[in-house]
């Protein structure tokens, strides 16, 4: 680990803010406000960074754009002016807002001619609890989890440059959904802004386009909705198609799969005049970018006229649907299916504006029921897409809960909301057996119990006497599978039951697909049920040691290893079968806590280690003051940075150990104690906020050890010895 020269507190924004401890030790009395770093090798020959800090209650201010002013928690942000946009350049703090999740491979690709579904998220001005990058403690937050039904997610607000909060990009990308920000100008001020960059020469609008592309590329979202809702001068409107063409071309170069969409507002004369359709007055903008988002007051005759206008680009016309049903619109609210029926009849894509109506206008206590009702009414008009890459791992966590659970063990109690932590969600709804059978299975979110995170998947169903089993398809996949695949399912039944649960999968390319270790369930040979492993293979024991065992919280894990050659994995199903010999009607309630599908060879590859953990941007606040007027307890806030190959990580769990009263800088960590969980990070940095610690006495060091636990994409626990570590030693001024 390289170290730099001693830095002042004002330079703490740099990534490596300290000097070797032995060089700085003699400078402590002369420079009591400075921080020092050293290295030591512990008994296990692991390198550990040590930082020294003299407590001060006058920290340097943090840049307001990036941090909540009251707590210093990192926040997502927007830009309000053209000057802010052109001046933007990435700082260290911008790293908090960079998406960890790449856009996963999906089928069909977004570029296919199939009509698409766009969700435009407009909720109460935007940047609500979702702005807190590391999550927040809020009850009954809004959540979206029907990702398999949508293709594009637009984050909308009335700020000039709406950069999507990173939590939405992480959640959407995990489901193969691309994310767009919004560039909007409105009213007289918007007209002046447009005049400033569109009415001039080519470099003026190219500079704006370049900056929009750089922002999308840096924060790892996928493009922009351009919404000019003010009149344009002749010079400005003349340059607008050129601006769109340049922006689209540059975005396609820098952001693979990137999109630029134009909202139906200004016409080619420069007049602000919504058309509710694509026509000759606005076609020039459609021809200059990737798609056209219509206004909402259309009728079927608008759709009929647009068929000829769009030609081969029907899917690039996104017909707007205001879910709030404001003004003179078709459908909306729980009648939104009427809008979609007409849109799909004519082959267009759909743009659902503000489907958060179910949260904003209906009872919060009934949110999940209303959310499921809303999307179930639209289901027949919403083609799904398939994920086509491994590893495929999900605990069904919604990114929220009333407590946190880590592999069956309760970690913290209290409400939390962290959308970046939302894991891949299944196909929700009611699934009935074909024909006259009365068998069914319903899938729901379950916040009352969890294996990992804050929720699980609840499956309720009925096996009628005339059939032996019922099954529900949870995931649509399109994965060319490797020769050997490891699968795992964690589940529990509610109450006593003899019903059996099994994981099933379907494969494509049946003629060339050779399967080992599975039962064939249908005549075509495409549906299979893996045989559970009683004992995991020795080479996988580190990851699958609990197979077949009862786990914490009453959960059970089943593991499978299957041999495949020339196969395409298409669907994951869960089936429920009646007890042998029984012909009674059987009902069941089952919770799924996790499903894993992993290339077995990837489990044998060595994982990278968390390295170079640093501590900077320290802030102290007195919490409790003793009889002598000195603080006895403190609140510590600081920023951790580390190095790790992010492509290998699902996230990082941050922990700490606290100790006071040691006069030795090499005091051992309380290895026998369980570290305190602080939070989740979806970047190579984390802001610790208001951590309560005991103040150190005169001549003593307080000690906090921070631990960074990597969570690999395969979803297994990493031994604590392989976590990253950094120690903060703090003392009172002499």
UniProtKB/Swiss-Prot annotation:
A Pfam family: Glyco_hydro_85
Disordered, as annotated region: 1-45
Positions of post-translational N-acetylmethionine modification: 1
Basic and acidic residues bias: start-end ranges: 22-31
EC number(s) per entry: 3.2.1.96
Keywords for this protein: Acetylation, Cytoplasm, Glycosidase, Hydrolase
Keyword Acetylation part of the UniProt annotation: yes
Catalytic activity: an N(4)-(oligosaccharide-(1->3)-[oligosaccharide-(1->6)]-beta-D-Man-(1->4)-beta-D-GlcNAc-(1->4)-alpha-D-GlcNAc)-L-asparaginyl-[protein] + H2O = an oligosaccharide-(1->3)-[oligosaccharide-(1->6)]-beta-D-Man-(1->4)-D-GlcNAc + N(4)-(N-acetyl-beta-D-glucosaminyl)-L-asparaginyl-[protein]
GO molecular function, one term: mannosyl-glycoprotein endo-beta-N-acetylglucosaminidase activity
Family membership noted in the UniProt record: Belongs to the glycosyl hydrolase 85 family.
Name under which the protein is recorded: Cytosolic endo-beta-N-acetylglucosaminidase
Organism: Mus musculus (Mouse)
Upper lineage: Eukaryota, Metazoa, Chordata, Craniata, Vertebrata
